A protein has these predicted regions:
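Short amphipathic alpha-helix that is part of the acyltransferase structural core
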Residues: 1-44, 77, 175-217, 242-245
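Beta-propeller domains
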Residues: 191, 202-208, 220-237, 247
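C-terminal amphipathic "assembly/sorting" segment characterized by alternating charged
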Residues: 299-349
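Conserved beta-strand-loop-alpha-helix junction that forms the acyl-donor binding cleft
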Residues: 114-144, 289-291, 317-327
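Conserved active-site tyrosine of GNAT-family acetyltransferases
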Residues: 15, 150, 330-331
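Conserved donor-binding loop and adjoining core beta-sheet/short helix segment
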Residues: 32-136, 238-256, 260, 275-282, ...
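Conserved catalytic-core motifs of GNAT/GCN5-like acyltransferases
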Residues: 116, 134-148, 154-164, 337-348
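Conserved acetyl-CoA-binding loop-helix of GNAT-fold acetyltransferases
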Residues: 90-103, 281, 285-289, 294-307, ...
């Protein structure tokens, strides 16, 4: 058994194939995260090019047992064991990955290792603690035995909430407001994505594990989704000329995608074109409001979203950290019950 660094094209292909084989025919897995894996490994975005990445795998008798991508984001004070995957009962193989992560951390001059973060919070976070249901678009999905490999680390829990649109709407109080809300301007998409970056960094920049974003970060990330988006999917709130909040929501595209199979951008676009009316869930991908406006503007943004989702039956949030009391309170009130549980693991070296 040995741990090897993935360097050439043949090894990278093997790395990607291990993941695909692992989830093949899994009835709860929708293969959308592969696009993020490809982005980091192939260095196709400004963000990916800014990161130091080192994919590694443990193999024995020409069989891959476990793998991950070691990542150092220049804005983080830790390294990541991102996109961890492995077979069951492979404690020794995972231990070898951890040792290499420690070596990598020392090379990068940091003393923390995070397991369960995939490059940046905007690309996905969390190992699944329970997942007997298909993953939603922009949420992670992993084998539920993975957390057992990291119980020696500090656990940070996060969860997603779900409720019916009817109940969700009933929890929102509508009040007169001096604030204005507008949709994204696709004619000035680059400019609005920089506004999105600015407001996002200013509002959720203190969230655990969040790293400041670089220029073009959201233009590259959300730009790939433009075919699937309508202008009302991204909302900005203003106090006069000052942007004070944002909300990004979208249909759960995964509901109409094939499970346990490889999905290409073309196949996703085709199925969306043919079956988009069958989607019954919307995802509240992210919402951020400057502190002094929280409450009033938060509710106004959610009420604005409600104008566009009458044809859906359910709403589900993205992740919420368990120790974020404000976010947990509003999600419990509006979001209903906890639908999914995830965890991230932290190591000090």
């Amino acid at each position: 058994m040995n741990c090897v660094q993935v360097k050439d094209k043949k090894q990278i292909k093997r790395f990607k194939n291990f993941r695909r084989t692992l989830y093949k025919n899994d009835p709860f897995y929708v293969s959308t995260v592969e696009f993020t894996v490809d982005m980091l490994l192939d260095k196709t975005t400004k963000f990916a090019k800014s990161c130091i990445t080192r994919p590694i795998m443990v193999e024995e008798n020409q069989q891959v047992l476990a793998q991950c991508v070691l990542v150092k984001n220049p804005y983080d004070d830790f390294v990541q064991m991102a996109f961890f995957e492995g077979l069951e009962r492979q404690e020794q193989a995972v231990a070898l990955l951890k040792e290499q992560a420690k070596v990598f951390a020392k090379e990068m001059g940091v003393r923390r290792i995070i397991v369960g973060l995939n490059g940046h919070l905007s690309y996905g976070v969390g190992l699944s603690l329970d997942m007997e249901k298909p993953n939603t678009f922009d949420s992670t999905y992993t084998k539920t035995y993975y957390p057992q490999y990291f119980t020696d680390g500090k656990e940070h829990k996060l969860m997603a909430f779900r409720n019916t649109i009817e109940v969700f709407r009933s929890k929102l109080v509508q009040r007169p407001s001096k604030f204005t809300v507008r949709t994204v301007d696709f004619e000035n998409f680059s400019k609005d994505m920089e506004l999105f970056k600015q407001v996002c960094d200013e509002t959720i920049g203190t969230t655990f594990l969040y790293a400041p974003t670089q220029d073009k970060h959201f233009e590259e990330l959300i730009g790939e989704m433009k075919f699937f988006l309508r202008k009302e999917n991204i909302l900005f709130a203003f106090d006069g000329n000052e942007a004070v909040g944002f909300l990004f929501w979208h249909p759960d595209y995964n509901e109409i995608l094939k499970k346990g199979k490889q999905n290409s951008l073309l196949s996703i676009a085709l199925r969306y074109t043919l079956f988009k009316k069958k989607i019954k869930t919307v995802k509240v991908n992210s919402i951020g409001v400057k502190e002094k406006y929280q409450g009033r503007v938060t509710i106004q943004l959610l009420n604005e979203m409600m104008k566009y989702i009458n044809s859906y039956d359910y709403a589900e949030t993205n992740f919420v950290w368990e120790n974020n009391r404000k976010s947990m309170a509003i999600n419990r009130h509006i979001g209903g019950h906890i639908e999914r549980n995830f965890a991230v693991y932290e190591y000090e070296i």
